[in-house]
Regions:
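Flexible glycine-/small-residue-rich
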Residues: 15, 72, 94
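Redox-cofactor binding/interface segments in oxidoreductases and associated redox assembly factors
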Residues: 13, 70, 192
Length: 277
């Protein structure tokens, strides 16, 4: 039917939440490549609920889409099974996975956390802590792997870790700093898995008159908007979300034009050195 052939120019993108870090940038990168080629992206939010993602994909897969795009997050076995057996390209983007459904483009979280921790160590800090908060279990494992690798390489204790069962936001960062100082008064640097956590920790430092970076260095992850405006400006790891979107768009386009998918090297993340470390 005319509708069926028309909808095969539609690519479905399911994300947990549009306000997710870097999501709109990745979407813009995809649009930049796919729109001029005649494809429309239909965007749907699963609100971090696996059963909602299942419902959305069940509907979308029944409507003759050209391809499916997901963020590199946990998917249910049902979704993985459907997508592996669907005769369309599937792109997971954002971070590299050990077990992608099909195509996968993103940063290497292990390498990024290793590089960030290594930089803190090279600056002379030794009593370093790692603050994590609610995030995908496999991303937490990857961050932990990079952290352990850097700390153990320099024979430093990797045990100052708090994984808070709270969202990775400002208030969690502010609430967890006292916990670190209570457990490890010798703490001289804090690595945070998001800029929001790091900025929350900075607010708490100001409240307690802890000088950053003289008394305590703080670094974040993501190079979000807030990292440039907090006081002092935050040293962080930049994730090139738009580039990830562009590369994912190009790879999808090639595949849709009957090209092959060759495993893609991770997209490099880069250190942003500012005043907090």
């Amino acid at each position: 039917s005319a509708l069926a052939s028309a909808s095969s120019w539609t690519i479905a993108m399911v994300v947990p939440n549009l306000s997710e870090a870097g999501c709109s940038e990745m979407f813009a990168g995809l649009q930049q490549v796919l729109q001029p080629a005649g494809y429309q992206i239909m965007l749907a939010e699963s609100q971090h609920r696996l059963e909602q993602e299942e419902k959305l994909l069940e509907t979308l897969l029944a409507s003759n889409i050209a391809a499916a795009i997901l963020l590199s997050v946990e998917h249910s076995d049902t979704v993985r099974h459907w997508l592996k057996n669907a005769s369309i390209p599937v792109m997971e983007m954002g971070a590299m996975r050990a077990d992608p459904i099909d195509m996968n483009i993103g940063i290497d979280n292990v390498a990024a956390m290793y590089e960030l921790t290594e930089m803190v160590i090279q600056r002379g800090y030794q009593n370093i802590g790692l603050l994590c908060a609610n995030q995908e279990q496999w991303i937490f494992q990857q961050h932990l792997q990079g952290w352990y690798k850097a700390m153990l390489r320099h024979h430093l204790s990797p045990n100052r870790v708090i994984n808070a069962a709270m969202p990775p936001n400002f208030s969690t960062g502010a609430a967890q700093l006292p916990e670190f100082l209570l457990a490890w008064p010798e703490l001289d640097a804090l690595v945070c898995v998001s800029d929001e956590l790091a900025c929350g920790a900075l607010y708490e430092c100001q409240r307690r008159r802890i000088k950053v970076p003289d008394d305590l260095a703080v670094v974040g992850f993501g190079d979000s908007d807030v990292s440039r405006v907090c006081q002092p400006p935050l040293t962080t790891m930049a994730v090139p979300h738009r580039k990830i979107g562009i590369e994912a768009g190009k790879a999808l386009l090639e595949r849709l034009n009957d090209g092959d998918w060759r495993d893609h090297k991770p997209i490099a993340s880069s250190l942003c050195l500012r005043e907090s470390c």
